[in-house]
Amino acid sequence: KGELSQYVNPLITVTISDNEVVVSRSSDEKQERAFHGLYRALINNMVVGVSEGYKAELELVGVGYRVSNTGNVMELALGFTHPIFMVLPAEIKVETKTERNKNPLITLESCDKQLLGAVCAKIRSFRKPEPYKGKGVKFVGEVIRRKSGKSAGAK
């Protein structure tokens, strides 16, 4: 599905043997243990990403919230006086779906989990879900903690 590369700190050694990637460290110092776990997870994410790929779905909840894309340029209408145009990196494939009486969906696919998460966070940051009505850009399946709002008759 693609090709990924990663810088590795000199304290950590990465070797490939018998179709297996082995991450090892020279000592048990705290920083080396931390780097060991970090690079093991990053390499695992890269292997899974290149073999299977990653997918993220965002949902636009709110009246008049729309999304459309032409190639890798996404146009978001999120209740502002202007549309938001976002140019996505070439490694990310985007698909938008708008059905009648359903919230618009944005489906992002990539082999790079880190980049995919950063782009999703950027899109979500344009209009985060608010706790009173739940309007905004949220991940599919994300539960928004709701608040009751003004308490009626509380004196």
Where in this protein do the model-derived segments appear?
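N-terminal intrinsically disordered, cationic/polar leader segments
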Residues: 1-36, 40-48, 52-121, 125-155
